[in-house]
């Protein structure tokens, strides 16, 4: 049976979304699900921690002296708040590149206060406001550390993206990783719902 998510306007259901989901324990064993736990889907932003591994694989963390804050914004979808924008800006400055190198595009901040401030002051959002700009900064940092061109880093055949594909192959054991192109222009891996938590399992910190 699929999961249904409802949104209401007043007392009436305005939207209904059908979803499939899978819940696994730390060993990757399926413990609960709705819909089809074997459904293949694009990981999209859920893959950001996987994609951030290039920082460590290329030694970019040490090469540029990246801070925990900069590593965190690489792994996450940020809200475009002033603090997040400043973090990405200093990140790029540290690796010697400007915002124009980001291939993620621009959109209004998710942070409502920041969004309304831009609208009220008639300012356009920049690439730094994109929720994916931290991830893209990490890819640029990896490219610079590798000695690869920062231009075209979002393309599937770029050395940075080839490293990302290898990470997914190593974690999944699959030789072929299907993908599409995400809204921010980089490859979006396709994985099974149940496969994704099993692939995260080796990274879990147990206390």
Task: Annotate each predicted stretch with a short phrase.
Residues 62, 147-155, 178, 203-207:
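Inter-helical turn/loop segments and adjacent helix faces that build the functional surface
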